[in-house]
Design a protein with these regions (language model features):
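Extreme N-terminal signal-anchor transmembrane helix of membrane signaling/transducer proteins, especially
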Residues: 1-14, 18, 23-62
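Short hydrophobic/aromatic beta-strand element in the GNAT-like acyltransferase core
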Residues: 127, 184, 275
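Short, intrinsically disordered, charge-balanced linker/junction segments flanking boundaries
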Residues: 253-256, 260-265, 269-278
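Extracellular/periplasmic ligand-binding regions of membrane signal-transduction receptors
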Residues: 73-78, 82-113, 133-144, 204-205, ...
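Extracytoplasmic/periplasmic ligand-binding sensor regions of membrane-associated signaling proteins
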Residues: 120-124, 133-213, 263, 267-270
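Solvent-exposed, extracytoplasmic
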Residues: 107-124, 153-155, 159, 193, ...
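Juxtamembrane interface helices immediately C-terminal to a transmembrane segment
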Residues: 38, 52, 56-75, 79-86, ...
Length: 278
C-alpha cells in the first residue's frame, strides 16, 4: 500500500515536472518571439532612418552641385563680358593714339611720348611700341626693352603688318622672351598710305589689368578660373607655370571651342573632379 502511494506521488511529481517544463518552454518561446519582434522593429527603424538620411544627403548634394554649377556659369559669363569690355577699351586707346601719330609720324619725340603715355595712363599694357611699315621699331615703352631700331620678326609683328587692320594676336614668345598677346592698330596718313602700327602687349605671365581681373575673384571655396584660346592654349591659369600649355582631353574646353556655354561635372586633364561653368 505504501509503495503504491509512493508510486502515485512520484507519478504526480513527474507530471508536474513535465507541466513546468512545458510552461518554461512556452515562456522561452514567448521571450524569443518578443526579442525577435523587438530586433525586427529596431532594424526597420534604423534602416528607415539611414535610408531617409541617405536620401536627404543625395538631395542636398544634388541641390548644392546644381547651385554651384549655376554660380560658376554666371561668374564665367560675367568675366567674359568684363574681359571683352577691357579688350574693347584697349583697342579704343590704340585707335586714338593711331590718329595722333598719323599726323606726326616723323616726329620721334611725339612717338616716344605717345608710347609712354599709352603705357602709363591706364596700366592696360605691359609695354607699347610703334613699328613702321617695314617692321622696324621707331619707339617703345619701357625703354629698358632696348628695341628701338630693331626689326621685329615675331609672329605678332608679322600678323599686324600683313593684316593692316585692328587685331589681337595669338599668344607668342616676344623678342625679349615673354609670352605675350599684342593688340595693335594700323596707322594711315591722310592720303590713306599705310605707315605702320602701334601696339600694346599683354604679358601673360606678369601682372597687369587683365591678369588682375582674372586673378581676383570672390569665391573662397577652392574654385579657380582659367582662360584658353582657340588652339587650346592656356592664356591664364592660377598656376603660372601652366600658362602657354596646350590642354587636350578636357570636355569643357572642347565644348567651349564648339561655341557652347553651360555647366557640367567632369574629371579634368589633371584627373581632378570639377564642377565647371563655361
Amino acid at each position: 500500500m505504501l509503495s503504491f502511494i509512493v508510486s502515485i506521488i512520484a507519478k504526480e511529481i513527474q507530471g508536474q515536472h513535465r507541466e513546468v517544463s512545458i510552461l518554461l518552454g512556452r515562456v522561452n518561446i514567448n521571450l524569443d518571439l518578443k526579442k525577435l519582434i523587438l530586433f525586427l522593429a529596431i532594424s526597420v527603424t534604423v534602416i528607415t532612418f539611414l535610408n531617409g538620411f541617405y536620401s536627404s544627403y543625395q538631395v542636398q548634394k544634388q541641390q548644392l552641385q546644381s547651385q554651384t554649377l549655376k554660380n560658376h556659369n554666371a561668374y564665367a559669363a560675367k568675366l567674359v563680358s568684363a574681359t571683352d569690355r577691357f579688350l574693347l577699351a584697349a583697342q579704343q586707346q590704340l585707335a586714338y593714339s593711331a590718329k595722333i601719330l598719323a599726323i606726326q609720324f616723323n616726329d620721334a619725340n611725339t612717338l616716344a611720348q605717345e608710347t609712354q603715355r599709352l603705357r602709363l595712363q591706364t596700366d592696360s599694357f605691359n609695354s607699347t611700341v610703334v613699328v613702321d611699315k617695314n617692321g622696324v621699331v621707331l619707339a617703345h615703352s619701357p625703354l629698358s626693352l632696348k628695341l628701338k631700331g630693331q626689326l621685329l620678326e615675331s609672329d605678332g609683328a608679322k600678323q599686324a603688318l600683313a593684316n593692316k587692320k585692328p587685331m589681337i594676336s595669338e599668344p607668342y614668345i616676344s623678342a625679349v622672351g615673354n609670352l605675350v598677346i599684342v593688340i595693335s592698330h594700323p596707322i594711315f596718313n591722310s592720303q590713306g598710305e599705310y605707315l605702320g602700327y602701334i601696339g600694346g602687349t599683354l604679358y601673360l605671365k606678369q601682372k597687369g589689368i587683365l591678369h588682375d581681373l582674372l586673378q581676383v575673384h570672390f569665391h573662397k571655396d577652392g574654385s579657380y578660373i582659367y582662360v584658353i584660346d582657340k588652339n587650346r592654349r592656356l592664356l591664364y591659369h592660377p598656376d603660372v607655370a601652366r600658362i602657354g600649355e596646350q590642354v587636350f582631353g578636357n570636355p569643357v574646353i572642347e565644348a567651349v571651342l564648339r561655341g557652347e556655354s553651360g555647366t557640367r561635372q567632369l574629371i579634368n586633364s589633371q584627373n581632378i573632379v570639377m564642377l565647371a561653368g563655361y
